[in-house]
């Protein structure tokens, strides 16, 4: 569900009139192809996942972990998230080409072939799992492999296309980096790790439902049964509010599990604003007024960033 759109490569980029023109064309094509492969990894999603990983590692360690371990997890986690996204693009190439939001991605524009995308995704997945297995531990590597397989084979290939609860069931994948980061440090999973996992898990519904509201017609055109596409406004509002409240409540459950006021106070404040924005959106939607769902979408990103920044700061103090 990346917001990234890509500019297609010109159909004449690789054609040549003469030897010199052909060489220049190929040289110009290389950056575009590299950019296309990078776009397949959905860098913005990778960035958001890493925002949750490092603070979880810091809390698990009780401070800043060894820099080499942080580097390994960041590289391995980035490759894993990128692999999952590339394979997602490969599986979803049929629906991406009919959605306005995604039709300029590399596969619909034929900038990258499906075969090459599949190979690229599998290579990234193999390297990421191997890296974590060699330099961290079996639990972190196993969680990474499980997250990739679940996201692509269970969520993308099956649940996304068949159930209105697709966002809920896919939420475990988005929250997995918290567990992976924690496991890389300790080799186990403590209650605090599961609490932070819960925050990210529940957060994804009030984060992604507004996106689906904005692109409702796009998802309908592709036949994807996102909740805002097929359910009533009342049902969508109820789920946004229930999961927004669960997100904030679980974030407070994490407070006594090794965190202090440096975490708790900012979390209370930003949580209150997050809930206010969720209620505003739902109130306007229920009245049939014009809504700006992306306001909650962006606010939810701010919320998660502040909460995990507070986790990191608390772990350092």
Curated annotation (Swiss-Prot):
Keywords: Cell membrane, Heme biosynthesis, Membrane, Transferase, Transmembrane, Transmembrane helix. It is an enzyme of class 2 (transferase). Residues 1-21 are annotated as: Disordered. Disulfide bonds: none annotated. One of its GO terms (cellular component) is plasma membrane. NCBIfam families: cyoE_ctaB, PRK04375.1-2. It comes from the Bacteria. The lineage of its organism: Bacteria, Bacillati, Actinomycetota, Actinomycetes, Micromonosporales. Its EC number is 2.5.1.141. GO terms for molecular function: protoheme IX farnesyltransferase activity. The chain crosses the membrane at residues 45-65, 67-87, 116-136, 139-159, 182-202, 240-260, 262-282, 297-317. It comes from Salinispora arenicola (strain CNS-205). GO terms for biological process: heme O biosynthetic process. Converts heme B (protoheme IX) to heme O by substitution of the vinyl group on carbon 2 of heme B porphyrin ring with a hydroxyethyl farnesyl side group. Pathway: Porphyrin-containing compound metabolism; heme O biosynthesis; heme O from protoheme: step 1/1. Pfam families: UbiA. Carbon 2 of the heme B porphyrin ring is defined according to the Fischer nomenclature. This is Protoheme IX farnesyltransferase. It catalyses: heme b + (2E,6E)-farnesyl diphosphate + H2O = Fe(II)-heme o + diphosphate. Belongs to the UbiA prenyltransferase family. Protoheme IX farnesyltransferase subfamily.
């Amino acid at each position: 569900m990346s917001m990234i759109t890509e500019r297609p490569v010109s159909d004449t980029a690789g054609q040549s009139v003469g030897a010199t023109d052909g060489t220049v064309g190929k040289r110009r094509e290389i950056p575009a192809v590299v950019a296309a492969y990078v776009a397949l990894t959905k860098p913005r999603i990778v960035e958001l996942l890493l925002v949750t990983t490092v603070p979880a590692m810091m809390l698990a360690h009780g401070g800043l972990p060894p820099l080499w371990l942080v580097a390994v997890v960041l590289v391995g986690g980035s490759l894993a998230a990128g692999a999952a996204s590339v394979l997602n693009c490969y599986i979803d190439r049929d629906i991406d080409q009919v959605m306005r939001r995604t039709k300029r991605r590399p596969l619909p524009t034929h900038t990258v072939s499906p075969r090459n995308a599949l190979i690229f995704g599998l290579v990234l997945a193999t390297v990421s799992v191997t890296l974590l297995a060699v330099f961290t531990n079996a639990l972190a590597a196993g969680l990474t492999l499980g997250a990739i397989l679940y996201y692509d084979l269970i969520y993308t290939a099956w649940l996304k296309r068949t159930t209105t609860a697709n966002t809920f069931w896919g939420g475990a994948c988005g929250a997995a980096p918290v567990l992976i980061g924690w496991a890389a440090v300790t080799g186990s999973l403590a209650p605090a790790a599961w609490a932070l996992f819960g925050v990210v898990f529940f957060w994804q519904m009030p984060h992604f439902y507004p996106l689906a509201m904005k692109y409702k017609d796009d998802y309908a055109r592709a036949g994807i049964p996102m909740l805002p596409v097929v359910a009533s406004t009342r049902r969508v509002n109820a789920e946004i509010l229930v999961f927004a409240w669960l997100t904030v409540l679980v974030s407070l459950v994490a407070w006594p599990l090794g965190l202090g006021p440096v975490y708790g106070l900012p979390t209370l404040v930003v949580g209150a604003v997050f809930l206010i924005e969720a209620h505003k959106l739902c109130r306007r939607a229920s009245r049939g007024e014009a809504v700006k769902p992306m306001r909650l979408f962006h606010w939810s990103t701010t919320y998660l960033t502040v909460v995990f920044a507070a986790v990191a700061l608390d772990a350092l103090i």
